[in-house]
């Protein structure tokens, strides 16, 4: 199997994770979903703040998952349905074992 055929789930939040996500897409890797933090109010006006990774995923037209809880059954079912080969994590939350172990080749 060619590395670019792998079904990759990308997990991250800040700007420097966005750079890596964009590079993977630019290089032709198959990102089947992006997992990032839920939108949250920030600042004086409590305007909704979207993570840099979410903004990048939207710009690239990638599917998004934004679970409140990483052990949520709905999220886990959605992740399983993607049948990921590989998970790439850059500056994201601590992953529960069930998420960490889901991709058949592992999560890095």
Could you tell me what each predicted segment is?
Residues 1-108:
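One-carbon transfer enzymes
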């Amino acid at each position: 199997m060619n590395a670019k055929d792998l079904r990759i789930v990308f997990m991250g939040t800040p700007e420097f994770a966005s750079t890596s996500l964009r590079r993977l897409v630019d290089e032709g890797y198959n990102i089947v979903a992006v997992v990032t933090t839920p939108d949250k109010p920030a600042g004086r006006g409590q305007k909704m703040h979207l993570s840099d990774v979410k903004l990048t995923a939207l710009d690239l037209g990638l599917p998004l998952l934004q679970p409140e809880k990483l052990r949520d059954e709905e999220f886990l079912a959605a992740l399983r349905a993607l049948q990921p080969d590989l998970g790439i994590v850059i500056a994201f939350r601590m992953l529960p074992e069930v998420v960490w172990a889901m991709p058949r080749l592992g999560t890095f």
